[in-house]
Design a protein with these regions (language model features):
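Conserved NTP-binding catalytic cores of kinases and kinase-like/nucleotidyltransferase enzymes
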Residues: 1-85, 208-213, 330-332
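An alpha-helical support segment within catalytic cores of ATP-dependent transferases
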Residues: 5-19, 146, 158-197, 201, ...
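Active-site acidic catalytic loop and adjacent metal/ATP-binding pocket
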Residues: 33-50, 54, 85-86, 183-231
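ATP-binding pocket architecture of kinase catalytic cores
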Residues: 41-145
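A cross-family kinase active-site recognition segment
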Residues: 120-170, 190-192, 226
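Active-site activation/catalytic loop segments of kinase-like enzymes and analogous catalytic loops
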Residues: 230-271, 287-304
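ATP/Mg2+ or Mg2+-diphosphate-binding catalytic cores
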Residues: 292-332
Protein backbone atom coordinates (compact mmCIF):
# COMPACT_ATOMS: atom_id res chain seq x y z
CA UNK A 1 0.00 0.00 0.00
CA UNK A 2 1.44 3.34 -1.05
CA UNK A 3 0.08 6.86 -1.55
CA UNK A 4 -0.35 8.17 -5.09
CA UNK A 5 -3.37 10.49 -4.70
CA UNK A 6 -3.29 13.10 -1.95
CA UNK A 7 -6.40 14.31 -0.10
CA UNK A 8 -6.86 17.29 2.20
CA UNK A 9 -8.01 16.98 5.80
CA UNK A 10 -11.30 18.59 4.78
CA UNK A 11 -11.83 15.86 2.18
CA UNK A 12 -11.02 13.13 4.67
CA UNK A 13 -13.43 14.72 7.15
CA UNK A 14 -16.26 14.79 4.60
CA UNK A 15 -15.76 11.22 3.37
CA UNK A 16 -15.42 9.74 6.86
CA UNK A 17 -18.49 11.62 8.00
CA UNK A 18 -20.62 9.67 5.52
CA UNK A 19 -20.05 6.64 7.76
CA UNK A 20 -20.34 8.40 11.08
CA UNK A 21 -16.56 8.29 11.55
CA UNK A 22 -15.28 11.44 13.27
CA UNK A 23 -12.05 12.22 11.42
CA UNK A 24 -9.09 13.56 13.39
CA UNK A 25 -5.96 12.59 11.46
CA UNK A 26 -4.80 10.55 8.44
CA UNK A 27 -1.40 8.85 8.28
CA UNK A 28 -0.12 7.36 4.98
CA UNK A 29 0.48 3.61 4.77
CA UNK A 30 3.59 2.93 2.69
CA UNK A 31 3.54 -0.90 2.46
CA UNK A 32 2.21 -2.33 -0.80
CA UNK A 33 2.38 -1.07 -4.35
CA UNK A 34 -1.03 -0.45 -5.94
CA UNK A 35 -3.45 1.82 -4.06
CA UNK A 36 -3.43 4.91 -1.84
CA UNK A 37 -4.01 4.02 1.81
CA UNK A 38 -4.16 5.81 5.13
CA UNK A 39 -4.74 4.93 8.77
CA UNK A 40 -7.56 7.08 10.15
CA UNK A 41 -7.53 8.38 13.71
CA UNK A 42 -10.88 9.45 15.15
CA UNK A 43 -11.81 11.63 18.11
CA UNK A 44 -12.33 8.42 20.09
CA UNK A 45 -8.81 7.10 19.46
CA UNK A 46 -6.09 7.89 21.97
CA UNK A 47 -2.40 8.65 21.50
CA UNK A 48 -1.15 6.81 18.39
CA UNK A 49 -4.17 4.53 17.98
CA UNK A 50 -5.94 4.26 14.64
CA UNK A 51 -9.32 2.59 14.31
CA UNK A 52 -9.96 2.66 10.54
CA UNK A 53 -8.23 2.24 7.18
CA UNK A 54 -9.12 4.53 4.27
CA UNK A 55 -8.33 3.20 0.76
CA UNK A 56 -8.52 5.02 -2.57
CA UNK A 57 -8.28 2.51 -5.41
CA UNK A 58 -5.95 3.80 -8.11
CA UNK A 59 -6.46 1.15 -10.80
CA UNK A 60 -9.60 -0.90 -10.22
CA UNK A 61 -12.88 0.55 -11.49
CA UNK A 62 -15.78 1.48 -9.23
CA UNK A 63 -17.64 -1.55 -10.65
CA UNK A 64 -14.77 -3.86 -9.67
CA UNK A 65 -14.63 -2.48 -6.13
CA UNK A 66 -18.39 -2.88 -5.81
CA UNK A 67 -17.95 -6.59 -6.59
CA UNK A 68 -15.19 -6.77 -4.00
CA UNK A 69 -17.51 -5.34 -1.33
CA UNK A 70 -20.03 -8.11 -2.02
CA UNK A 71 -17.28 -10.71 -1.70
CA UNK A 72 -16.01 -9.31 1.59
CA UNK A 73 -19.46 -9.24 3.13
CA UNK A 74 -19.96 -12.86 2.02
CA UNK A 75 -16.80 -13.84 3.91
CA UNK A 76 -17.21 -11.76 7.06
CA UNK A 77 -18.76 -14.53 9.17
CA UNK A 78 -16.29 -17.21 8.03
CA UNK A 79 -12.89 -15.51 8.13
CA UNK A 80 -11.19 -12.64 10.00
CA UNK A 81 -11.71 -9.80 7.54
CA UNK A 82 -12.80 -6.18 7.88
CA UNK A 83 -15.98 -5.69 5.81
CA UNK A 84 -16.29 -2.14 4.42
CA UNK A 85 -18.34 0.29 6.49
CA UNK A 86 -21.89 1.04 5.34
CA UNK A 87 -22.96 4.67 4.81
CA UNK A 88 -25.39 6.27 7.23
CA UNK A 89 -27.72 6.84 4.26
CA UNK A 90 -27.62 3.17 3.14
CA UNK A 91 -30.88 1.72 1.85
CA UNK A 92 -29.86 -1.93 2.10
CA UNK A 93 -30.84 -2.55 -1.52
CA UNK A 94 -27.26 -2.70 -2.86
CA UNK A 95 -24.35 -3.46 -0.53
CA UNK A 96 -21.86 -2.10 -3.08
CA UNK A 97 -23.52 1.30 -3.42
CA UNK A 98 -24.04 1.38 0.34
CA UNK A 99 -20.27 1.18 0.93
CA UNK A 100 -18.42 2.70 -2.05
CA UNK A 101 -17.57 6.41 -2.34
CA UNK A 102 -16.02 8.15 -5.35
CA UNK A 103 -13.23 10.67 -5.80
CA UNK A 104 -12.39 11.75 -9.37
CA UNK A 105 -14.08 8.52 -10.53
CA UNK A 106 -11.92 6.41 -8.21
CA UNK A 107 -13.53 4.19 -5.60
CA UNK A 108 -13.00 4.76 -1.88
CA UNK A 109 -13.72 2.42 1.03
CA UNK A 110 -13.39 2.81 4.78
CA UNK A 111 -12.91 -0.37 6.83
CA UNK A 112 -12.29 -1.08 10.52
CA UNK A 113 -8.61 -1.52 11.34
CA UNK A 114 -8.03 -5.12 12.35
CA UNK A 115 -5.84 -6.00 15.31
CA UNK A 116 -2.57 -7.82 14.79
CA UNK A 117 0.74 -7.36 13.00
CA UNK A 118 2.23 -8.50 9.71
CA UNK A 119 4.52 -11.51 10.18
CA UNK A 120 8.22 -11.08 9.48
CA UNK A 121 8.72 -14.85 9.57
CA UNK A 122 6.39 -17.85 9.34
CA UNK A 123 6.38 -21.36 10.80
CA UNK A 124 4.68 -24.63 9.91
CA UNK A 125 1.73 -23.97 12.25
CA UNK A 126 1.06 -20.62 10.57
CA UNK A 127 1.28 -22.24 7.14
CA UNK A 128 -1.23 -24.90 8.24
CA UNK A 129 -3.58 -22.14 9.42
CA UNK A 130 -3.21 -20.30 6.11
CA UNK A 131 -4.02 -23.47 4.19
CA UNK A 132 -7.26 -23.81 6.14
CA UNK A 133 -8.09 -20.13 5.64
CA UNK A 134 -7.55 -20.22 1.88
CA UNK A 135 -9.62 -23.38 1.47
CA UNK A 136 -12.39 -21.80 3.56
CA UNK A 137 -12.31 -18.76 1.28
CA UNK A 138 -12.56 -20.96 -1.82
CA UNK A 139 -15.48 -23.00 -0.46
CA UNK A 140 -17.39 -20.01 0.94
CA UNK A 141 -17.22 -18.03 -2.30
CA UNK A 142 -18.73 -20.94 -4.22
CA UNK A 143 -22.07 -19.57 -2.98
CA UNK A 144 -21.66 -16.53 -5.28
CA UNK A 145 -22.89 -17.71 -8.68
CA UNK A 146 -22.19 -17.30 -11.48
CA UNK A 147 -18.67 -16.69 -10.18
CA UNK A 148 -17.73 -14.68 -13.28
CA UNK A 149 -20.18 -11.96 -12.19
CA UNK A 150 -18.16 -11.31 -9.03
CA UNK A 151 -14.53 -11.64 -10.07
CA UNK A 152 -12.59 -8.74 -11.54
CA UNK A 153 -10.96 -9.09 -14.98
CA UNK A 154 -7.63 -10.88 -14.96
CA UNK A 155 -4.62 -8.73 -15.80
CA UNK A 156 -3.06 -9.23 -19.23
CA UNK A 157 0.24 -10.68 -18.05
CA UNK A 158 1.00 -12.07 -21.50
CA UNK A 159 1.26 -8.50 -22.81
CA UNK A 160 3.57 -7.53 -19.93
CA UNK A 161 5.66 -10.64 -20.59
CA UNK A 162 6.13 -9.73 -24.25
CA UNK A 163 7.23 -6.21 -23.32
CA UNK A 164 9.61 -7.24 -20.56
CA UNK A 165 11.21 -10.30 -22.17
CA UNK A 166 12.20 -8.14 -25.14
CA UNK A 167 14.69 -6.38 -22.85
CA UNK A 168 15.69 -9.27 -20.56
CA UNK A 169 19.04 -11.07 -20.77
CA UNK A 170 18.71 -14.19 -22.90
CA UNK A 171 18.85 -16.63 -19.97
CA UNK A 172 16.10 -14.78 -18.06
CA UNK A 173 13.83 -14.61 -21.10
CA UNK A 174 14.39 -18.33 -21.73
CA UNK A 175 13.49 -19.14 -18.12
CA UNK A 176 10.30 -17.10 -18.39
CA UNK A 177 9.30 -18.63 -21.73
CA UNK A 178 10.04 -22.21 -20.66
CA UNK A 179 7.92 -21.89 -17.51
CA UNK A 180 5.05 -20.34 -19.46
CA UNK A 181 5.19 -23.17 -22.01
CA UNK A 182 4.98 -25.73 -19.20
CA UNK A 183 2.03 -23.88 -17.68
CA UNK A 184 0.23 -23.89 -21.04
CA UNK A 185 0.49 -27.69 -21.08
CA UNK A 186 -1.15 -28.21 -17.67
CA UNK A 187 -4.53 -30.01 -17.62
CA UNK A 188 -7.34 -27.63 -18.54
CA UNK A 189 -9.81 -29.23 -16.14
CA UNK A 190 -8.13 -28.04 -12.93
CA UNK A 191 -10.86 -26.84 -10.52
CA UNK A 192 -11.67 -23.14 -10.77
CA UNK A 193 -13.54 -20.57 -8.75
CA UNK A 194 -13.20 -17.20 -7.04
CA UNK A 195 -9.62 -16.79 -5.76
CA UNK A 196 -7.84 -14.12 -3.71
CA UNK A 197 -4.67 -14.18 -5.89
CA UNK A 198 -2.58 -11.94 -3.61
CA UNK A 199 -2.44 -13.75 -0.26
CA UNK A 200 1.08 -12.75 0.70
CA UNK A 201 2.16 -12.62 4.33
CA UNK A 202 1.93 -8.83 4.27
CA UNK A 203 -1.76 -9.20 3.43
CA UNK A 204 -2.33 -11.05 6.70
CA UNK A 205 -2.35 -10.02 10.37
CA UNK A 206 -1.50 -12.18 13.37
CA UNK A 207 -1.63 -12.08 17.15
CA UNK A 208 1.71 -13.30 18.51
CA UNK A 209 0.94 -12.74 22.19
CA UNK A 210 0.24 -16.41 22.99
CA UNK A 211 2.17 -19.63 22.58
CA UNK A 212 0.74 -20.07 19.07
CA UNK A 213 0.31 -17.34 16.47
CA UNK A 214 -3.37 -16.61 15.81
CA UNK A 215 -4.62 -15.34 12.43
CA UNK A 216 -6.50 -12.07 13.01
CA UNK A 217 -6.86 -10.57 9.55
CA UNK A 218 -6.93 -11.22 5.81
CA UNK A 219 -6.44 -8.10 3.69
CA UNK A 220 -6.59 -6.74 0.12
CA UNK A 221 -9.36 -8.36 -1.89
CA UNK A 222 -8.82 -6.18 -4.98
CA UNK A 223 -7.54 -9.06 -7.11
CA UNK A 224 -10.31 -11.60 -6.43
CA UNK A 225 -11.04 -13.28 -9.74
CA UNK A 226 -12.05 -16.60 -11.26
CA UNK A 227 -8.93 -18.72 -11.61
CA UNK A 228 -7.60 -22.18 -10.88
CA UNK A 229 -7.70 -22.78 -7.14
CA UNK A 230 -4.21 -24.22 -7.55
CA UNK A 231 -2.94 -20.82 -8.67
CA UNK A 232 -4.19 -19.25 -5.44
CA UNK A 233 -2.58 -22.08 -3.49
CA UNK A 234 0.75 -21.62 -5.29
CA UNK A 235 0.78 -17.84 -4.83
CA UNK A 236 0.23 -18.21 -1.09
CA UNK A 237 2.73 -21.04 -0.70
CA UNK A 238 5.37 -19.07 -2.59
CA UNK A 239 5.34 -16.31 0.00
CA UNK A 240 4.47 -18.12 3.23
CA UNK A 241 6.93 -20.95 2.62
CA UNK A 242 9.85 -18.82 1.40
CA UNK A 243 12.36 -16.96 3.54
CA UNK A 244 13.36 -13.73 1.83
CA UNK A 245 16.84 -12.53 2.74
CA UNK A 246 17.69 -8.87 3.33
CA UNK A 247 20.05 -6.71 1.29
CA UNK A 248 22.68 -7.41 3.96
CA UNK A 249 22.79 -11.12 3.15
CA UNK A 250 22.50 -10.78 -0.61
CA UNK A 251 18.69 -11.06 -0.70
CA UNK A 252 18.71 -14.85 -0.57
CA UNK A 253 15.64 -16.93 -1.45
CA UNK A 254 15.07 -20.11 0.58
CA UNK A 255 12.01 -22.31 0.00
CA UNK A 256 10.86 -24.61 2.83
CA UNK A 257 9.10 -27.81 1.75
CA UNK A 258 8.06 -28.65 5.34
CA UNK A 259 6.07 -25.42 5.46
CA UNK A 260 4.54 -26.25 2.08
CA UNK A 261 3.39 -29.67 3.29
CA UNK A 262 1.88 -28.07 6.42
CA UNK A 263 0.01 -25.61 4.21
CA UNK A 264 -1.33 -28.39 1.98
CA UNK A 265 -2.38 -30.45 5.02
CA UNK A 266 -4.33 -27.46 6.33
CA UNK A 267 -5.92 -26.79 2.96
CA UNK A 268 -6.96 -30.40 2.45
CA UNK A 269 -8.65 -30.47 5.85
CA UNK A 270 -11.25 -28.22 4.20
CA UNK A 271 -10.98 -29.01 0.47
CA UNK A 272 -9.02 -32.07 -0.77
CA UNK A 273 -6.86 -31.57 -3.86
CA UNK A 274 -7.49 -33.56 -7.00
CA UNK A 275 -4.82 -35.85 -8.47
CA UNK A 276 -4.31 -33.39 -11.34
CA UNK A 277 -3.81 -30.53 -8.89
CA UNK A 278 -1.12 -32.46 -7.04
CA UNK A 279 0.68 -33.26 -10.29
CA UNK A 280 0.46 -29.68 -11.56
CA UNK A 281 1.62 -27.96 -8.36
CA UNK A 282 5.39 -27.80 -9.14
CA UNK A 283 4.79 -26.06 -12.47
CA UNK A 284 2.19 -23.77 -10.93
CA UNK A 285 4.64 -22.70 -8.21
CA UNK A 286 7.17 -21.70 -10.88
CA UNK A 287 4.54 -20.00 -13.04
CA UNK A 288 3.14 -17.95 -10.16
CA UNK A 289 6.64 -16.77 -9.29
CA UNK A 290 6.97 -15.46 -12.87
CA UNK A 291 3.64 -13.61 -12.53
CA UNK A 292 4.89 -11.69 -9.50
CA UNK A 293 8.25 -11.18 -11.19
CA UNK A 294 6.31 -9.51 -14.02
CA UNK A 295 4.06 -7.62 -11.61
CA UNK A 296 7.04 -5.97 -9.93
CA UNK A 297 8.62 -5.12 -13.27
CA UNK A 298 5.27 -3.68 -14.35
CA UNK A 299 5.08 -1.45 -11.27
CA UNK A 300 8.56 -0.11 -12.02
CA UNK A 301 7.51 0.50 -15.64
CA UNK A 302 4.37 2.46 -14.71
CA UNK A 303 6.07 4.41 -11.93
CA UNK A 304 8.61 5.54 -14.51
CA UNK A 305 5.96 6.25 -17.17
CA UNK A 306 3.80 8.28 -14.78
CA UNK A 307 6.61 10.00 -12.91
CA UNK A 308 5.69 8.43 -9.57
CA UNK A 309 8.43 9.18 -7.05
CA UNK A 310 8.85 9.94 -3.37
CA UNK A 311 9.06 8.28 0.02
CA UNK A 312 5.41 7.19 -0.12
CA UNK A 313 6.05 4.95 -3.17
CA UNK A 314 7.08 1.36 -2.46
CA UNK A 315 8.78 -0.87 -5.03
CA UNK A 316 9.49 -4.55 -4.34
CA UNK A 317 12.54 -6.22 -5.85
CA UNK A 318 11.57 -8.28 -8.95
CA UNK A 319 14.81 -10.28 -8.78
CA UNK A 320 13.56 -12.14 -5.70
CA UNK A 321 10.67 -13.60 -7.68
CA UNK A 322 12.98 -14.37 -10.59
CA UNK A 323 15.20 -16.39 -8.24
CA UNK A 324 12.20 -18.20 -6.78
CA UNK A 325 10.95 -19.08 -10.27
CA UNK A 326 14.39 -20.44 -11.14
CA UNK A 327 14.52 -22.43 -7.90
CA UNK A 328 11.18 -24.09 -8.60
CA UNK A 329 12.10 -24.73 -12.24
CA UNK A 330 15.27 -26.62 -11.33
CA UNK A 331 13.10 -29.14 -9.42
CA UNK A 332 10.77 -29.95 -12.34
Amino acid sequence: MSVYTHLSDDEFFAFCGLFGVTFKKAVPITQGIKNSNWFIQTDSDVDDEFSHVFTLFEERSVADITKMVTIMHALKDKLPIAPPLVKLTATGDDIGSDCVMRYENKAILVVPKLLGTHPTTTNTAMCHTMGQALATLHKTLQTLQPAENYGVPLYDWARVKERETAYMPTDEARLMNDIWAAYANLPHDLPRGLCHLDMFADNTLWDFSGDTARLTGLLDFTEVSVEHYLMDIAITINDFCTTWGSARDGESVNFNTDKMMAFIDGYEAIRPLTDNERTALPVMLAYCATIFWLLRLNVIYYNREQGRTGDDIMVKNPDLMKRLASLHWTKI
